[in-house]
């Protein structure tokens, strides 16, 4: 029996999700559209194989071809980011961060990381996350007037609290991060430096954002987002000693068997990112985001956090529309534009409502959108948020979205 006929509930849901992605404008900054090669690798026969251990040192037989796949991913990751060592087995960015902490600090140690509401990540010390429960996190944020990182304040906090580790990187921060400054601050207080480049890895690979690898003791990342690979994690270092700790922290520390079909997807994505065309794509991602900023900066109801973007994302306060982030997300979803509600610096609302939304351009750029298309999308967002109860406006925006998705299909 055909598997789709056997399980129609499952395959109908998958078909509807495929339809949603085809007909919606995906503006969630952490999402992208993988290539057919990445998708094929993830759906390959490698999903059948267990391979605990590392290439050449497996606990299972029959891994000779699995070793080739994993070594391809490792070697390509090292070349892509200029690192001496790479671990490609982490199932996610959070798993990568967990392994980094296990390799660098002990439970109860003090760590300096970016506050979640200022743009950090759950794994950078949020009290509801394992990181905040296991380590003594002290948070830094952004300057109230500029909404960018104040490195002088980071230095003051580091001198005051003497952390064993400083974490740089963010999940909702639109400006360039100065990793050299972070390294200097870490050295002043004899701290290690970890960089979580999950959101900007593709831009780093393309030379469009400073590379943290020369400055950090350990760099972690996801392999999706701007890198346009499968959902997974990556850990890089130039230290052989730390590489050994990272490997043992991943296996047997926090994981068992690696997902070799996902690692194959990573290898495929890394090869794509090494091609010169990927740098052109990354440049377009930034150009599209910066084109959108002009629209939001001209709309009096919208407030662009920090006033600009240097990367793929924009953080926008929407309270000027008389809305919170949850409401704005729902309104935009109703016209087939997908964003996520997001806290803003010095947030006054709960994380379930928020004052802002986060917008990213990786997915629409993968579909082929250029600056003029990004401008149109930004104008549609402003149009519907200004008049959320007007059904005529909804219909007009929906029609414009449909025209754009038809012009730029998900897969040509």
Swiss-Prot record:
Annotated site residues (Plays an important role in substrate specificity) in this chain: 224
Compartments where located: Cytoplasm
An annotated GO cellular component: cytosol
The protein's enzyme class: transferase
PROSITE patterns: SHMT
GO biological process entries: glycine biosynthetic process from serine; tetrahydrofolate interconversion
Swiss-Prot/TrEMBL keywords: Amino-acid biosynthesis, Cytoplasm, One-carbon metabolism, Pyridoxal phosphate, Transferase
Catalytic activity annotation: (6R)-5,10-methylene-5,6,7,8-tetrahydrofolate + glycine + H2O = (6S)-5,6,7,8-tetrahydrofolate + L-serine
Function of the molecule: Catalyzes the reversible interconversion of serine and glycine with tetrahydrofolate (THF) serving as the one-carbon carrier. This reaction serves as the major source of one-carbon groups required for the biosynthesis of purines, thymidylate, methionine, and other important biomolecules. Also exhibits THF-independent aldolase activity toward beta-hydroxyamino acids, producing glycine and aldehydes, via a retro-aldol mechanism.
Family stated for the protein in its record: Belongs to the SHMT family.
Protein name: Serine hydroxymethyltransferase
